[in-house]
Amino acid sequence: SENVRASLLAYKMDTPVGPWRGPYSNVHAFSSQCFIHELATAAGRDHLDFLLEMFGNPRWLKPDDIRSLNTERAVGVIKRAAKEGNWGKPMGVREGQGLAFYFCHAAHVAELAEVSVDSANRVTLRKVTVVADVGPIINMSGAVSQIQGAVIDGYSAMVSQKITMENGVIAETNLDSYPVLRIDAAPEVDVFFIESDYAPTGLGEPALPPLAPAVANAIFSATGRRIRKMPLSELGYSV
């Protein structure tokens, strides 16, 4: 079949909850972008070529809504990320690159991650190249900081952040049990913008969703092991 139907269910909880940075986009990006990489691998295709081919001809997915996904803008950030991150360069043993794209909050963002994984499953995220098309940039230093922060935030969540419930109460009460990434594990983050003439979009959240699938795809390239759930600490990985 060429058609897929997806649905969401709103579930009422008795425990107070709040929004996560990027909300549902984080879950969708991780599952969809990792699966696209699996499809490319199964087809024996280069992930970059496979991803670009999916977008087809330049167009707005919703022609009457200029804040919808634009395939030309998507292709633009993906190609730029591949170029700036040197996609396909020779990598050493247990080293790999991973690519991911996601569209949310009217922003198009692509990320390329470089990792190494030692024999004890210690992951080193060496570098993340981020390219975003969010329209005109008014405050460049602020924009760069937003993306750098999103990468660190996203990697923190991917590595070790988990919420557990015990008798209706959240067990993690402070940063000792819900840790944020330390500076010695923080990657180099290269940020680039395609400054189009389209209306400015949000920037506080869009760079977070592509991070986890980019890193997961890089780990597979380095080790041959798929990452299908998070956090990595639950799978025997450390940083």
Residue ranges and their predicted role:
Residues S1-V239:
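Cofactor-binding beta-sheet edge motifs in enzyme active sites
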